[in-house]
Each structure stands twice: as structure tokens, then as C-alpha cells.
Amino acid sequence: MEQTYQYAWIIPFLPLPVPMLIGLGLLLFPTATKSLRRMWAFQSVFLLSIVMILSMNLSIQQINSSSVYQYVWSWIINNDFSLEFGYLIDPLTSIMSILITTVGIMVLIYSDNYMSHDHGYLRFFAYMSFFSTSMLGLVTSSNLIQIYIFWELVGVCSYLLIGFWFTRPVAAKACQKAFVTNRVGDFGLLLGILGFYWITGSFEFSDLFQIFNNLISNNEVNFLFVTLCAILLFAGAIAKSAQFPLHVWLPDAMEGPTPISALIHAATMVAAGIFLVARLMPLFIVIPHIMNFISLIGIITVFLGATLALAQKDIKRGLAYSTMSQLGYMMLALGMGSYRSALFHLITHAYSKALLFLGSGSVIHSMETLVGYCPKKSQNMVLMGGLTKHVPITKNSFLLGTLSLCGIPPLACFWSKDEILNDSWLYSPIFGIIAWSTAGLTAFYMCRIYLLTFEGHLNVHFQNYSGKSNTPFYSISLWGKEGSKISNKNFRLLTLLKMNKNARPSFFSNRVYKIDENVRNRIQPFLSIPHFGNTKTYSYPYESDNTMLFPILVLILFTLFVGFLGIPFTQDVDILSKWLTPSINLLHKNSNNLIDWYEFSKDAFFSVSIASFGIFIAFFLYKPVYSTFQNLDFLNAFVKMGPNRIFYDKIKNAIYDWSYNRGYIDAFYGRFLTAGMRKLADFAHFFDRRIIDAIPNGVGLMSFFLAEVIKSVGGGRISSYLFFYFSYVAIFLLIYYFFNL
């Protein structure tokens, strides 16, 4: 066991050769490197698989022995200061390592096919491997300095991956927005680290916790300053995990490739903030009011993320706000002191959300055959629907991920979310009401995404998706409002496929199409897919290749069974509690973690009932027109409600506007913060040019004009110069003679 721990330092560096070799190959042998580019996917998966095996070995030893191992190298600068680097292996490290590697491997396998036609294929895998290295280095860090170094590397990688298609203006703005927003949190994190070093004199976690606890117990610190430093540390987690009010970058991060969205939202960037708070939990629990502040930010994010997801039309943005809300649940659990529940939900949510994002990528991939390589169309749920018969495997996997996030047993997220909901009642009834209500909203918007994507009919054939006018096939629009039906009852799908017979050769001729608006041009037949040397023409979506389906099927297994890790059947079978021992759980200090089946059944029935109610409302509003409700005129009974109809419509429209416009938070930041900063910059520019520069420039101008005046007096004649010279000499001699009399 000791040997395994001694060589654990290699874990963060194993994926690093891939970006280094890709960069070296492109510099020295660019043609050969590009022609053999598919082999880099295998190397990336292979190296990350080795890391996964090492992480699993460490996790098994953690479960059996519950030990903590730390190895440190000292870098002595002088006698008064030494900087130490090392690695820390504990339950939190092993959990995060397995999470990063398992999800990362699935995303890499998926990306090999998803990015196969992209000219940035090599750059993509270089970024991905460096991303894995940065995150693994973060979770194995033994002190705050290492945390900050790898924290910044994670931010740089996310900036590069979000702006992967940097020639698209929208993607370029999105990565800049993510980078600037995280700068705010990272600056707070740096100040907090320096503040605690000033208090304790150490960056090492073990020394930091011990010294700080002694100072607190002896009342030898300024609590106001300590609280400020803790809030600054927490600001880094707020930005990284997209907590209110620094959450605005998360939906725009969807401009990157879909595999990146899966990795960011499941196991890397957004998980970094949760990891930081969990790592520093011994520091936070001894500071008055900071835990309450963490739980407050968490519950606000829970509800805000759910409300903003209600009316999103972009499938990836809807899932992004779902991630924001679920991260709020984790932060709420950490703030309540429910350490086990927070990490349990981090695990279950990671696999379920990775499944949903890879499933959405499969949907987007199939829709591109109809609407082209434009994210505004291929990700728009308005144009989807009726995909069940075209992509059955993707549909079933997406349904399982949806039900898991809704909290339907026995899927993964049910077990972890149910623990957080129960703990919220113990902590605060108000927080409990908000958390349980948001569980219903989660079921509603997730079921809404599923219904709009897979049920009904393929709307792209029935809509003018130019962006100016839409003619929906459904009698209920996206938000449940009345919509116009198709006016042409004899409409046929074949008319969409018929072209001018005389121009038929040009229909299937090779043409250049713009891919994803990122200036990636590809020569291909219109609506044709190359597959094993054969060319097939599609007028409908098609199921993804096996390379993309395999990771989805593996994530289905995780979604089905990973939740059972946290079920405490008996003291010997409670794997998660053994894994996290010793762990911090303020709400259940004296609990032996054994499950009370009566209490569990009662709470589970309540939570499942709320989730079922949200699912029912979604089916009621978004079920296709040829449903039982439509045939029985069930909806018409609610249309004729009399004067109250106007009031209900106003409420409905207000909720829709709030959700679709992102709660007006982005607009507020744009109008007041961004505009204010620009005005301040303009004022600083004016002050610098007109006042600061005016002083030396004014002296220079005065010297110039004075020289011109003196020059004009002389006139440019030598006789005049001699006359003035002797006149001045005579005057000075007279003055000298007068004063010496």
C-alpha cells in the first residue's frame, strides 16, 4: 500500500504527454501529425485509463483503511520562508480522481467521432488532455498555493475550450465572458489565500487547519477579518461553480463543442468550486456565520437556476441552467454541514448530467443533417420533436438521465437529492420549502426538454425557421400558449424533398457549406453522410455511430447503479460512508448512517410525489396535439375560464419573460456594471490625455512659443545679433559699476 501512495504523484502528469507531443509534432512533422491524427484519441484514452486504474486502486485502499497520505517536498528559499509542494491522498481526492477519469474517458471516446470532421481535431484533444491534467493536479494538491496554480490552469483550459471555435464571434465573446467572470472570483480566492497565510503563516492544509483552530479556540484572531478572508475564499468557488451572482458565464459556455459541455458540467470546472469548499470545510465550520452564508448562496442558486431553465429553447442552455441548480443543491448541503450528501450528489449528478449532455450531442449531431451546421438551429428544441423513432437509443438514454435528474427511484440522483431535501428540513423550514419546490420545477423543465425533443412530430418540416416567423405544427406553443395550426391540411413531407428536376444533378453535387459558423469549410454532398465508404442521403435524423453510442451506454450503467453506493443497508455495506470516513456531517453527528426505512419511505414518497406533479404539468403543457387531452377537449375547458384567463396569462407571460431573459441579470450587469466600467474607462482616458498629459505638453508648448518670440526679435541678421549682444554687455557693465560705487 505504501508503494502505491508513493507513486501517486504521477497521476496528474500521465495525460500531459499528449498535448506536448501534439505540439511538438505539429512543429516538426506537421503533415505526418495531421495525417495520423486519429491515433491521438487512442493515446489520450489509454493514458487516462491508466490514471483511472490507479485512482480505483487508491479508492479501494481508502475504503479498507480510511487513511490519509501526504507527501511533501520542501523548497527552501531562506531561513525564514520555505515553500512546499506535494500531493495529498484522502477520500475526497480519490472520489474526485475517479469522477474525472471515468467521465473524461467517456467524453474522449465520444469526441473521437463527434469531432472527426473538425479541422481542430488535434487542438481539441490537446486541450482536453491538458484539462484533465489541470483538474487532477487540483484535486491532489496539498496546499493552497498548488490549489491556486492548478485552479488558474483549469480556468485557462476552460477559456480555450469554450472558445474552441474562436472564429465565431459568439464563441469568442462567450469565452471572454467566462474568463472575466472567473477573474472576479479568482482574485477573491488569491486575497483569501494571502489573508489566511498572514493569519496562520502556512499554506499546508494540515498546518493551516490546526493553527487556525487553536487561534479560534484561544480567541486570538479578529473575527471580522477572518470572516472577510473566508468570504474571499468562497468567492472563488462561487465563480467556478456558477453560483449566484457569478453564474452568468455558464449558459454562454455552451458555445463550445458538446463534449466540452459534458466535461465542464460533469466532472471538471464546475466541480472545482464544490471541491474547494469541501476541502476547506474544516476552516469554514469554525467561523461564525460563514456556513449560513454558504447555504444561503446555495439555496438562491437552486431556485434561480430552476426558474431560468423553464423557458429555454436551446437544449444545451436548458441543461446548463439545470447544472447551475444542481450545483446549488451541493453548495446548500455543504453550507448545512451535510458533507456526505453533498459529495454523494456530486457523484450521481456528474454521471447523469454527462449522460444528458452526450445524449443532447447525439441529437444535435442528427439534426445537423436537416438544418445544417448552425447551433442556433441544430440546438433549437422548436425544430425538434418526433425523434423517438429516428434515434431510439439516444431517446431511451436521455429519458433515463431525465428521470434520474427528476429524482425518480431507483436512478442515481434520487438517492442523493433525497438526502439533501431531508437535511434541508432539519436545517431550516424555509430552505426546505424552497428546496422541495425546486425539485418539482426540476422535474417540470427536464420533462419539458425531453418532450420537446423526442415526442410529437419533427417540427423542422413544419416550420419556417428563418427566425422571422414560425408556423408551429402544435396547437400549444413552447410555453403552453395557443398557437396557430398548419393551414395547409394537404401538406406532405415529400414536398420538402422535391427539387427542380432539371437541377437535380446540382442537388447532389459537391458544394461548400459553412460548418458551425466557425469558418470550417467542408466539401460534401447536400444532406449526405459518408459511412464506411458509402454515401447515404438522409431526409430525417439518424442514430449516431457506435463510437458515440458506447459512452452513452456506459453512462447509463453508472446512472442506474452508482446511487446504490450511498445506501446504508447495514454498517458493513455502507460503502460511501466508509469511503468518506472520517467525514464532517454537522446535521448527523451521532448518526450511525443506518437507514430508517419507515422515515425513508415517507420522505421518498413525498419527494417522488412532487417530482411526479412536475412531470404531469409538463405532459399537460407539452404533450403533442394528437393526445388524449386534445381528443377530449380537455385543454379547451381551461381556455374558457372567463375573466381570470387574462390574469393567468399575465402571470404566465411574466414567468416566461423572467426565464427567457435570464432573470434580467445579464441585462443588469450589461447596463450598470459593463456600461459603468466603460464610462469610468472613458473618464480615465480623458483625465490622462487632457489633464495628466496636459502638464508636460503645456510646458513644451510654452517653451516653443517663447523661443518663437525670441527668434522673431532677432530677425535673422548678424548685425542685429551683434547690436543686441553689445547692448546687453553694456547694460550689465553699467549695473555692475552702479552697485560697486
From Swiss-Prot:
Pfam family, one: Proton_antipo_N
Transmembrane segments: 9-29, 40-60, 89-109, 125-145, 147-167, 185-205, 219-239, 258-278, 283-303, 327-347, 354-374, 396-416, 425-445, 549-569, 605-625, 721-741
Gene3D superfamilies per the UniProt record, alphabetical: 1.20.5.2700
Keyword Magnesium in annotation: no
Record's subcellular location: Plastid, Chloroplast thylakoid membrane
Membrane topology, from the record: Multi-pass membrane protein
GO CC terms, sorted: chloroplast thylakoid membrane
Catalytic activity: a plastoquinone + NADH + (n+1) H(+)(in) = a plastoquinol + NAD(+) + n H(+)(out); a plastoquinone + NADPH + (n+1) H(+)(in) = a plastoquinol + NADP(+) + n H(+)(out)
Keyword NADP: yes
GO biological process, one term: electron transport coupled proton transport
Enzyme nomenclature, EC number: 7.1.1.-
Top-level enzyme category: translocase
Gene Ontology molecular function: any one: quinone binding
Keywords from the UniProt entry: Chloroplast, Membrane, NAD, NADP, Plastid, Plastoquinone, Quinone, Thylakoid, Translocase, Transmembrane, Transmembrane helix, Transport
Origin superkingdom: Eukaryota
Subunit text: NDH is composed of at least 16 different subunits, 5 of which are encoded in the nucleus.
Similarity comment text for this entry: Belongs to the complex I subunit 5 family.
UniProt function note: NDH shuttles electrons from NAD(P)H:plastoquinone, via FMN and iron-sulfur (Fe-S) centers, to quinones in the photosynthetic chain and possibly in a chloroplast respiratory chain. The immediate electron acceptor for the enzyme in this species is believed to be plastoquinone. Couples the redox reaction to proton translocation, and thus conserves the redox energy in a proton gradient.
NCBIfam families per UniProt: NDH_I_L (TIGR01974), PRK06590.1 (NF005141)
Name under which the protein is recorded: NAD(P)H-quinone oxidoreductase subunit 5, chloroplastic
